[in-house]
């Protein structure tokens, strides 16, 4: 584990014909104006506003789940998994922001291309990916101050957390990361947003070495690996239904109470705003929160960094 050196994220090419860059799908993108921007993902809608941009339309999750205050004039054009293509075109957009990890959105590339609508795909499972997206957005808006405030300053926050953890030289805890929803639960490795942060902080994710956990989450496998910390992220409209599933299918097992993580009180329900949705300008808070749970000995020092 090493605290990363501050990185300089490459600026998009600015020409007389607008801003040119390559998106997360590998598509070359040129955007000439961004007066009527449509975002098909709530977290990216927020990121665009953090860069000083305004939105003509976005999907339901931006308002109903993220709770973004985008004003009364903004149009809602379906959900992030079922965007209304007619409504998108009705907004007469000059730039559409899409999520590279939602298949229903990646399928829109040809449709938007044929309609002549400039668009780009992004994914932000790591802070560096968020920083690159913010760099592109701020190149459009010209708001270098917001890139500093919502990007580079956050990068420094993360570096401070990682440096503190690294210098403490504490034993690396074994952890289990669970993603729960109303009808089930899956163990997650390090190839997702929260898993990547845990790895950065030195945690050893038992699912990275035990593929059986990823394929079939069972109490027997969890008992065999006996993690020191268990982290739960819920998804879906009802957090309570996800927690009910866990209670009925995992916690009801008599062996659950014998797990080291449960006995030591190291079973944590993580904040969806920081660990399910993309934290954007709150990435530093996400890292501090996880670090304090992994290494409670450092809680006071981490709090001082806030």
Regions found by a protein language model. Give the residues of each.
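Alpha-helical, coiled-coil/dimerization segments enriched in small aliphatic residues
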Residues: 62-64, 186-215
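Extracytoplasmic ligand-binding site segments that recognize negatively charged/polar headgroups
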Residues: 104-107, 122-136, 170-193
